Amino acid sequence: MDPVMVDAHLDLAYNARILERDLSLPLDRLREVDPHPETPLVTLESLREARVAVAFATLFVDPGEGGLEDWQEEVYAQLALYEAWEAKGWMRILRHGRDLEAHLARHREDRIPGLVLLLEGAHALASPEELAPLRQRGLRMLSLTWATRNAYAGGNAEEAPLTDLGKALLREMEGLGMALDLSHLAEEAAFQALEVFSGPVCATHANARALMPSPRHLSDRLMEALRKRDGVLGLVPFNAFLDPGWKRGDPRLPLEAFLRHKVHAEALLGPKRVGLGTDWDGGFGLEAVPLGLDRHRDLWSLGDEAFLGENWLRWLRSWF
């Protein structure tokens, strides 16, 4: 049986709706017609080609644009888009544990990706009670913040602790059987969340702060805390997250820059708790990823089946 890939972070609906990219196209065709300066890396076809069995697909709204009503409207529009894709047979939303194993069996034959839905940032929730309707439609994961602070917690770009409302939201997540994504969370709030929340935890898309000094990435101390919870870290092959000296417009970094983060994370978390979280087309494109990576299929050149898929599948099976 061929190994499969799991990508723990893809902004598919955001790309389709906000950037108006037709993700049903072959990737080469999308690159021909796409008007954006960043060359796209992802379409549904490129995921099938690479045997991406599971992708954590986001519901993402920029908290710097609009207000609560706008955010809520867009979250539900993105959710409806995923449901429409599922109705067309382009992908499958994985809502329950039984869906995961059934999907993996079918994926061997049809290579249709399965999506685990992730709300990236809780700013679109007016209260913890607004989480339940989203869970009923398939949401399984939540990150409390996207960069800036909100009513629930501080973010990586705006430090603040976990709030009382944030604690209530974490309790709501536990009751709904959801997982917590520590990405974009202020470190103080992340440690507080680990104390409050007893459910499954991970970081879908972050790198090693020891190699990339920035609050956006995980410190060694937070990696060790994640290890104690048997969580998984998804590493991001994005040059600006790999080398503090790299800036947009610079030549692409060698693949070794990404592998350094993998080695560091595996030393702290163990090789079974590090995986892939590309965040591809999340504000950058081909020009900003390491050399040798043109699309998902090229990640197989890393030759590590555990890192590319098995570690995330083990984590999902432990709670999903």
Each model region followed by its residue ranges:
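Aromatic-anchored, glycine/proline-accented short structural segments
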Residues: 188-229
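Loop-centered beta-sheet repeat module
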Residues: 159-195, 200-205
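Histidine- and/or cysteine-centered catalytic micro-motif in compact active-site loops
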Residues: 185, 206-208, 236-240
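N-terminal hydrophobic targeting/anchoring segments and the immediately downstream early-domain regions
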Residues: 1-160, 164, 213-320
